[in-house]
From Swiss-Prot:
Residues 18-162 form the Nudix hydrolase domain. The gene is NUDT16. It comes from Arabidopsis thaliana (Mouse-ear cress). Mn(2+) 3 binds at residues 78, 82, 144. CDD domains: NUDIX_DIPP2_like_Nudt4. One of its GO terms (molecular function) is pyrophosphatase activity. Its EC number is 3.6.1.-. Gene3D superfamilies: Nucleoside Triphosphate Pyrophosphohydrolase. Mn(2+) 4 binds at residue 144. This is Nudix hydrolase 16, mitochondrial.
Length: 180
């Protein structure tokens, strides 16, 4: 049984200029690049994607940013609720705009959304999480994730946001700490 409960409803949602504000993350980890586990060969980065609750394709965890939390808190919460992972929320990757047919409401009749995306270094995978009965999670290489992205804006967040950030910050040896 899962002690965590996913937030639901739109009463506490944030809106700005007719767009629903969303927070999300691209969870990542490093694995050995060879089958034998020989660390001398280096590490490969993998990103975690989740199944959609409304159709085919894979997604990164994201959801509404609510009035009682910061955008970083919302991104971390969505990672736990939708993907069942916790870790170190790293840098801001960018804002990505998209339209959502399922999130049209009185505050955003056109379904416009603006997602603030972050990198999340995964430290813990939970056995159960709030949406574990409706979502599956899958670790993928960057190339596999690009091919699997359900939404073009998420592909942009991965390629233009995450990959550029990783190359600039992580490949140059920045330490992973909780001080971001």
């Amino acid at each position: 049984m899962c002690d965590l409960v996913a937030r639901t409803g739109r009463l506490q949602q944030r809106y700005e200029d007719g767009s629903r504000l969303v927070a999300g993350c691209i969870p990542f980890r490093y694995v050995n690049s060879d089958k034998d586990g020989n660390s001398e060969s280096g590490k490969v980065i993998q990103v975690l994607m989740i199944s959609s609750s409304s159709g085919p394709g894979l997604l990164f965890p994201k959801g509404g940013w609510e009035n009682d939390e910061t955008v970083r808190e919302a991104a971390a919460r969505e990672a736990v609720e939708e993907a069942g992972v916790r870790g170190i929320l790293m840098d801001f990757l960018g804002n990505y705009e998209f339209k959502s047919k399922s999130h049209q409401d009185e505050f955003s009749p056109e379904g416009l959304c603006k997602a603030a995306m972050y990198a999340l270094y995964v430290k813990e995978e939970l056995a159960t999480w709030p949406e574990h009965e409706t979502r599956t999670r899958k670790w993928l290489t960057i190339e596999e994730a690009v091919e699997s992205c359900r939404h073009p804006w998420m592909k942009d967040a991965l390629v233009e946001g995450f990959c550029k950030w990783h190359k600039e910050k992580m490949v140059k040896g920045e330490e992973i700490t909780g001080e971001h």
